[in-house]
Amino acid sequence: MIKQTILAIALVFGALGQAMAEKKENKFYDPIVKKLEGWTIKVDPKLLKNENKELKSQVFTALANHLQRIKYILPEAKVKALQKLPIWLDHHYEPLSSMQYHPGVTWLRANRHDPRLVKHVHIPRAKALLDRGQWAKHPYVILHELAHAYHDQVLENGFQNKAVLDAYKKAKAKGSYKKVLLYSGQTVEHYGLTNQMEYFAECTEAYLGVNDFYPFVRAELNEHDQGMFQLLKKIWGEIR
């Protein structure tokens, strides 16, 4: 009888614990799904309120600009692959500031973020898309984050893709990224040395657009890191 009572109590507490966990997870809003330039955008309902009508219009115009520049330079097949990678747009999410890609749910749960952000490009603060400093420094930030998503979800073996990893290791060993020019005129260590993920995303910016670290553009990438240039030509297609 005592065992049955203990078991019943344990079951009750287990159910309560599960209910509390579900309630905690449900504190996050349900996004409203929109389409923009062929991409699925999961939008914070607050951004769509009438009081934010002007902000929403400006933000969507800016985001469309980012996506159009990807559409207009890449082959159609690559565009379609990228359009399968969703974007999550917050009005203003205080805990995070930088635009980022969320590859796994463990970090999201551990830091009490919405686990549904997993496998999304995340724009935590809509106004960042309108920031002049952001445009001056990082005009291809959305491409950068989508490159992370593509690396993770599309390339063979994801972030452990052998070709990218080998190119990164070779570039790191060569030391040619240790001191490079930053967009501001300073000489710094290239952000791409952080890991193979940042190396791929940073070099993709240079190959398809403009990066904030040297090599800034495609011709410079070909001169500075021909191996990665050739790999990106194979991955993204030749840009003429």
Enumerate the language-model features and the residues they cover.
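Soluble non-cytosolic domains of exported or imported proteins
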Residues: N50-N65, G133-V141, Y191-N195, N222-Q226
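A domain-start/cap signature at the N-terminus of enzymes
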Residues: F28-Y29, V33
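Metalloprotease/metallohydrolase-associated module, dominated by Zn2+-dependent proteases
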Residues: P115, R132, D166-R240
